[in-house]
Amino acid sequence: MKFGLFFLNFINSTTVQEQSIVRMQEITEYVDKLNFEQILVYENHFSGNGVVGAPLTVSGFLLGLTEKIKIGSLNHIITTHHPVRIAEEACLLDQLSEGRFILGFSDCEKKDEMRLFNRPVEYQQQLFEECYEIINDALTTGYCNPDNDFYSFPKISVNPHAYTQGGPRRYVTATSHHIVEWAAKKGIPLIFKWDDSNDVRYEYAERYKAVADKYGIDLSAIDHQLMVLVNYNEDSHKAKQETRAFIRDYVLEMYPNENLENKLEEIITENAVGDYTECIAAAKLAIEKCGAKSVLLSFEPMNDLMHQKNVINIVNDNIKKYHM
């Protein structure tokens, strides 16, 4: 089992954008000296539920601050960006970091974003797939020559070519059954979302297995990742209230048709929130449900920076003791 971090960079009544960005930098430099494998940065637009609209830009900055840890995007939304620009930036970061960059990507989860970026909502899945093909060609061969309904141009060289053979490691966020099935056919590992229920994660994992097996994909080589929120406190009530405040605005935005309190309770129960026993039990169950080989942790629900670092140290000690 491998462990990394992810940053959501939410802002709310207790956290302003400057504080969120500075904390991300400080925690990144701190964990670079520890036993974590990677850090991935969340992309969001047009709300306080994530102040990073350009995770590749942030990745470049954080790679420059660090020496050994891998860094990349958690969910770079390829449907709303030009695929050649994504490939150029990914290859450049791969070169500059000598292979430490990771490209986590995603389809667009918000219809309003598709419209604002002038993308055809009615052809979203097809556009997503075509964008990935262009990016994948560029990362693996250094060239692309698309001829589809969305992009058509002569063969070009995407410079610089990737440092890593085959391009930087790629993961796709499990945002829908369509995406999961598409990823399974290609053998692209998933990133399971922190706000999906264990039942949804299990359903996605089982569907991935079935489709991958049908297409002859070697599942032993697939290293799915699982996002988990962390708020450890022996005062379990405080941890849960703190986490509730941290995610409330996000849940309101992303789940407008669900009962707010029920969804908040589900997320808190199925992430590592509460006292030590509750955190371990919730994380263990979530991992079992989806079969992830790597866990990405966000310590952001804890308001106090020193408390964040103390909990990071506890996790780091356990990594060293049990997973190295």
From Swiss-Prot:
One of its GO terms (molecular function) is alkanal monooxygenase (FMN-linked) activity. The keyword Flavoprotein applies. It comes from Photorhabdus laumondii subsp. laumondii (strain DSM 15139 / CIP 105565 / TT01) (Photorhabdus luminescens subsp. laumondii). It comes from the Bacteria. This is Alkanal monooxygenase beta chain. Light-emitting reaction in luminous bacteria. The specific role of the beta subunit is unknown, but it is absolutely required for bioluminescence activity. Coiled coil: none annotated. One of its GO terms (cellular component) is cytosol. It catalyses: a long-chain fatty aldehyde + FMNH2 + O2 = a long-chain fatty acid + hnu + FMN + H2O + 2 H(+). The gene is luxB. It is an enzyme of class 1 (oxidoreductase). PANTHER family: BLR5498 PROTEIN, LUCIFERASE-LIKE MONOOXYGENASE. Heterodimer of an alpha and a beta chain. Pfam families: Bac_luciferase (PF00296). Keywords: Flavoprotein, FMN, Luminescence, Monooxygenase, Oxidoreductase, Photoprotein. Its EC number is 1.14.14.3. SUPFAM superfamilies: Bacterial luciferase-like. One of its GO terms (biological process) is bioluminescence. Belongs to the bacterial luciferase oxidoreductase family.
